Amino acid sequence: MISIIVPCYNEQESLPLFHKEATRVLQGIGQDYEILFINDGSKDNTLTEMRALAEQDPHVVYYSFSRNFGKEAAMYAGFCNARGDYVAVMDADLQ
């Protein structure tokens, strides 16, 4: 399994495109995968978007912090919860 960790802070507009592109690439690999979105205390509707994606796609898992703890804490939470044999961290804006 491949785990993709995506720390997110105010990324509601980026998440649908990220999900679409990441899913396209991951499906092409032919391995089981999961996408872990970590909401780092976003002030916009990032959490709502994560919930919607998780409802649509069983490969999506999300975790949410009560406040902003920083990217490193979000990455650590992702590493602690990733189930994959291979783990990568990506920015939600696809950079």
Task: For the regions a language model picked out, list residue spans one by one.
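Structured catalytic core of nucleotide-sugar glycosyltransferases
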Residues: 1-95
